[in-house]
Amino acid sequence: MSSNSIALAVIGGTGVYKLAQLDQVQTHEVDTPYGAPSGPIRVGMLLGHRVAFLARHGEGHSLPPHKVNYRANIAALQQIGATRVLALNTVGGITDSFGPRVLACPDQLIDYTWGRISTFCEEAGSEVQHVDFGHPYSPMFRSKVIAAAKVTGVTLVAGGCYGATQGPRLETIAEIARMRRDGCDLVGMTGMPEAALAREKGLEYACLAIVANWAAGCGDAQEITMAEVLSNVDAASSGLPELIGELARG
């Protein structure tokens, strides 16, 4: 790996709009054939390794989940040289092991979104790809995320099924009950089509889900407030710089 290569790219979700301890930061405005990404890509040094960061919802959280240009985000990260992408996704917990302030590295997902451009095989003349998506997150990269958590002492649930919903509204109790029956442990709004697009581009991709609240009808869930969400994300994210730094080592 050359000194100028990107060791790791991180996509930040709700409540994670910058990467703590990222030094010597350079800002890159990237154009792609699919339009502009959510915002500039910040590239800097984290614990001795070159790491890129992109805020999925834009700076100031200006983009709701269904308006994110997922294709441009993935293409932009690839264009700057990233080959490994760690996606930070703020989610709700459905099953008992996934309560607020839990970090999880899911191994499966179910897509409930609609109307989003979900492939790079869209324009006339583009190569048609039927990518294998049985394991939607890179198994080898997931194992490295889990190992990095152990090394840095970050408590992490290894596994779980992420259910991706359309948003931006939260789900009904009945919708969450259906998702539980389907086998979902977590619910979020940005897991797809991001994971599938990364697979089409040949990127190693894993999700680190930050549980901000109980989903509707689960746990001791009451009315969910944004203040509660951000507080729980902040608490659960305290060990992320060390985990990400360890992951960037290779």
From Swiss-Prot:
Gene Ontology biological-process entries: L-methionine salvage from methylthioadenosine; purine ribonucleoside salvage
Residues engaged in binding substrate: M189, N213, W214, A215
PROSITE patterns: PNP_MTAP_2 (PS01240)
Keywords: Glycosyltransferase, Purine salvage, Transferase
Enzyme Commission number(s) from the entry: 2.4.2.44
Pathway of action: Purine metabolism; purine nucleoside salvage
Signal sequence, renumbered to the chain: none
GO cellular component, one term: cytosol
Sequence similarity: Belongs to the PNP/MTAP phosphorylase family. MTAP subfamily.
Known partners and oligomeric status: Homotrimer.
Protein name: Probable S-methyl-5'-thioinosine phosphorylase
